[in-house]
């Protein structure tokens, strides 16, 4: 993977966190996240395919694994979002590494139990979260 210059990574890190926060606000108002992303991409034609892929993957991963990452509310949003992203995409993005570097190794877990163990290690949870926590 090509690694962009540090100033580009910093800009992407700031942008991705802002997009995620806007998506959270959108969902808290009772609106679907896919409509938010659609509106975002229409407003910002300058976002290329890589930007759109990063934003979409991060936002959907965040909401997919929210039941687990919310078990560590003291952690910053960036750390919880990066952990959720890494559950789906073990090869992280440089912008996410800048926002929330992980001490533990990232490996693709094949089972839900394996993913729960990874989340526990990344977020500092005493035990792996139960699968039932994923269902609202």
Where are these regions (language model features)?
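Class I Rossmann-like S-adenosyl-L-methionine
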Residues: 1-136
């Amino acid at each position: 993977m090509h690694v962009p210059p540090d100033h580009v990574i910093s800009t992407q890190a700031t942008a991705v966190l802002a997009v995620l926060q806007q998506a959270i606000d959108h969902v808290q108002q009772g609106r679907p996240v896919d409509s938010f992303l659609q509106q975002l991409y229409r407003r910002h034609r300058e976002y290329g395919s890589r930007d759109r892929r990063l934003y979409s993957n991060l936002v959907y991963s965040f909401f997919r694994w929210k039941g687990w990452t919310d078990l560590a509310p003291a952690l910053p949003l960036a750390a919880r979002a990066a952990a959720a992203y890494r559950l789906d995409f073990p090869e992280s993005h440089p912008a996410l590494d800048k926002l929330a570097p992980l001490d533990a190794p990232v490996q693709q877990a094949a089972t839900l139990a394996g993913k729960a163990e990874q989340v526990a290690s990344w977020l500092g949870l005493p035990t792996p979260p139960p699968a039932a926590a994923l269902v609202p």
